[in-house]
Amino acid sequence: MQAYFDQLDRVRYEGSKSSNPLAFHHYNPDELVLGKRMEEHLRFAACYWHTFCWNGADMFGVGAFNRPWQQPGEALALAKRKADVAFEFFHKLHVPFYCFHDVDVSPEGASLKEYINNFAQMVDVLAGKQEESGVKLLWGTANCFTNPRYGAGAATNPDPEVFSWAATQVVTAMEATHKLGGENYVLWGGREGYETLLNTDLRQEREQLGRFMQMVVEHKHKIGFQGTLLIEPKPQEPTKHQYDYDAATVYGFLKQFGLEKEIKLNIEANHATLAGHSFHHEIATAIALGLFGSVDANRGDAQLGWDTDQFPNSVEENALVMYEILKAGGFTTGGLNFDAKVRRQSTDKYDLFYGHIGAMDTMALALKIAARMIEDGELDKRIAQRYSGWNSELGQQILKGQMSLADLAKYAQEHNLSPVHQSGRQEQLENLVNHYLFDK
């Protein structure tokens, strides 16, 4: 088989002084950071959908890319050609993982029977590609939002037959993920939301979604899948309002249906932007709630109200994200999946490499800066000092439930409390972070 990216052998680390645009300048897989190889810290993955399925179409124009596997032809043959190119790309980019939706890798077909048969054939193809290349599956998922049947959602659809079709896709995709050794299975809401409350029963839809997720957990245990189940929050788009709005909202949902010990979060940077949060906030919130699982690394545009899915390029933003992740012990089954696409005008096939190389260098440099912050320990020290009062006898009695509200009121009066505000020193801390970022 002739190589598609025939002008490139493999992307290699050449260091920061190199001017080669098809080389890594900061990402050195074997470099030790805090005693662990950089590759093991970052656990990079490339996604199938934006990289090999998107044809460059948008709401105002048709497809702009010339991809051989997107031309007319026999669907399964084209899917196999796409897999050839995908694994050539993964190998040449040095990513240890990839991610997919079911219909990214396999033709959907005209019926459930065709869908299942096509997917089974493509799972065998992917298994062979993984064996040959050493690339592993970070996570799989089912696309329960693109087909018109999902216009009113999948699990939240008013029609139980649509709910059942979605269940079939999730069963099939999860079992495929299990067979391929996937380390996680992702559930993204897609169209699990509403356009107008005039035709929506919020309680009914929430109950449906909760039961669907309970069944997903039940099936995971039934088939012996040892990976992590992940929900990916997003506030809107394609629906006006989605039920998995942000990390805190999903936590409340999971608690309501007794799922908080079973499902974690896959946090996407651009979705945080759409929810009015920083990426840093959503990562820190997921960690604080005990739900952190994995990351879709990309960026949005603060001036635009939609999911632009650009490649991450801000070391400043991602250094703080990696700092939170390192403090929490790093990834376990999760990783950094590049849920990002080249721009519509980026029509050269090697633009796919430029986007990923820049993103991988960005995250590698962010990791090294975060490691310096961890080793120095000054930020943690400042936070510990700020909350040190809670280690006092009074603070501990409050936290351990040894004092009631009335007890505290009595204590405050008896001790004539007159606390004085202590500076938060935000400006000083921002200068400290800039020191880590810019001072060698």
Swiss-Prot record:
- Annotated binding of Mg(2+) 1, by residue: E232, E268, D296, D339
- Per the annotation, how and in what number is the cofactor bound? Binds 2 magnesium ions per subunit.
* EC number(s) on file: 5.3.1.5
Which catalytic residues are annotated? H101, D104
Positions with a binding annotation for Mg(2+) 2: E268, H271, D307, D309
Xref: Gene3D superfamilies: Divalent-metal-dependent TIM barrel enzymes (3.20.20.150)
Look up the record and name the cofactor or cofactors this protein needs: Mg(2+)
Asked if the record carries the keyword Calcium, the reply is no
Family of the protein in this entry: Belongs to the xylose isomerase family.
Q: What is this protein called?
A: Xylose isomerase
> What's the encoding gene here?
xylA
